[in-house]
Every structure is written in structure tokens, then in C-alpha cells.
């Protein structure tokens, strides 16, 4: 049994987000052919998904391809698109076995029609599964997400359906990606870098941050379990003082 498996459900993060960094460095360190670090990274996802299902995590969101990744060499972008396609195909039996809902977030307009159709089909076929939700962020950026939400509200104002003075953070929050999912409780970045890289900026406003030097292809469920156990020990204050939190816990 993992360290976190015995934790009370109230102590578990409902939503874990992961920046899967370190694939290229893993390939270089292990002298793999160019691009094969990404292949190893694709395979590393499966045990993490299974851990989350077994532990009772509601939502797992992984950063597969950022809006900035389009700037990478065309050959690498092509490989990444191929891997995303194969990942979706390979994940479908797992989604069916564990009753996992598969969702995608991001700007789909630059993606090929074939990939867009595959994503839509996967979402439709798993829409009724409720054991967990796996979200794959493709062509996603946090700034794009917020700007996209703002544009939606601007169109409503322009159409006379909304008064500009009625726009607040709650209304904007209902228009960002994953508005219907729990806010991110725990954000993990592998690979040793200490930055958010434009990932889920709105949704992670009060997330607990975890950084590890472990490269993504070497990231294992045991390390995730240790992080979840540490998460359960942290005091999340959401702007309040520790004394206020302690008082609320004593007199719920």
C-alpha cells in the first residue's frame, strides 16, 4: 500500500496537475535516438494514472504540449503530434477498464483535423465514466486560456447580453478551461526547473507547488505518493492566518 493510500479522503488533493518536463534531457543522458525521450515520457504516464485511480484522485491534468511548443523545430513538433495521437489510441482501453473520463484542454485550431476528430471521439466515448478524469493539455497556455475567457465575455457585452460592470473574478472563472472541475490543489513539475511555464495559471491560484529533479520518464508512483503524503501535512490558508485555520478546524 502506498504512503498516501491510507490517508483520509479529506486530506487528499482532488485535482493534481503535472508539468511533465525532462523528456529531451532523459533522451540525451541515456543516449537515445533523437525524440525517443518523448517516447519514454509517454510510457511513464500509465502508472501515474493508475496510482491516481487507486488513491481516489478526482482529476489528473497533464501538460502534454504548450502553445509555446509550436516554436520548436518542425521535426520535433511532428513527432510530438504523432505521439499525442498514439497516446490517445493507447489510453482508450485503459479509460474503459478503469472507467476514466478523458478530456482535452487547449486551442485546437492549430491541430490537424484528424487529431481534432480523434480527441472529440475519445471525449464522447468516455463522457459517462466517473472513476476519475484524465485531462490532457494540448496546445494550451494559461495566458491564452484567460484571454479566451475574456473574449467570450466581451462578445456577450457586445451583444447586449451582459453588463461590463457585472464581470468579476467568479464570472471570468466560469469561462476558463476546466471551469466545471475542482481547482488545482497540487501542481507538480518534474525535471528540476522551478517555473510554471504558463500552465493553468488561473486554476492553480492556490495550488501547493512541488518540484522534483526527477526527469519525467523516471517519475514513479512512489514519488508521487510521497508528495501526496506531504500535501496532506501542509496547512492551506487561502489568505487566512494559521490561527484562523486552526480555530475553524477546532470549531467546524
Task: Write out the residue ranges for each language-model feature.
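Flexible, compositionally biased loop and terminal segments
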Residues: 1-252
Amino acid at each position: 500500500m502506498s504512503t498516501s493510500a491510507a490517508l483520509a479522503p479529506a486530506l487528499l488533493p482532488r485535482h493534481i496537475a503535472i508539468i511533465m518536463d525532462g523528456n529531451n534531457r532523459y533522451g540525451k543522458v541515456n543516449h537515445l535516438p533523437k525524440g525517443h525521450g518523448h517516447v519514454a515520457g509517454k510510457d511513464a504516464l500509465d502508472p501515474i494514472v493508475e496510482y491516481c485511480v487507486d488513491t481516489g484522485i478526482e482529476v489528473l491534468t497533464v501538460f502534454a504540449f504548450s502553445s509555446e511548443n509550436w516554436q520548436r523545430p518542425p521535426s520535433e513538433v511532428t513527432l510530438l503530434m504523432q505521439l499525442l495521437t498514439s497516446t490517445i489510441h493507447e489510453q482508450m482501453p485503459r479509460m474503459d477498464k478503469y472507467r476514466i473520463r478523458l478530456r482535452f484542454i487547449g486551442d485546437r485550431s492549430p491541430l490537424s483535423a484528424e487529431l481534432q476528430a480523434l480527441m472529440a471521439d475519445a471525449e464522447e466515448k468516455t463522457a459517462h465514466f466517473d472513476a476519475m478524469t484524465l485531462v490532457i493539455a494540448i496546445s494550451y497556455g494559461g495566458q491564452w486560456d484567460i484571454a479566451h475567457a475574456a473574449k467570450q465575455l466581451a462578445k456577450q457585452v457586445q451583444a447586449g447580453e451582459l453588463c461590463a460592470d457585472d464581470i468579476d473574478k467568479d464570472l471570468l472563472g466560469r469561462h476558463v478551461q476546466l471551469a466545471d472541475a475542482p481547482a488545482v490543489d497540487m501542481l507538480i513539475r518534474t525535471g528540476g526547473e522551478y517555473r510554471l511555464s504558463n500552465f493553468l495559471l488561473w486554476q492553480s491560484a492556490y495550488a501547493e507547488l512541488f518540484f522534483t529533479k526527477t526527469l519525467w520518464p523516471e517519475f514513479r508512483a512512489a514519488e508521487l505518493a510521497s508528495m501526496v503524503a506531504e500535501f496532506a501535512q501542509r496547512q492551506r490558508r487561502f489568505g487566512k492566518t494559521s490561527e484562523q485555520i486552526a480555530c475553524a478546524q477546532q470549531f467546524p
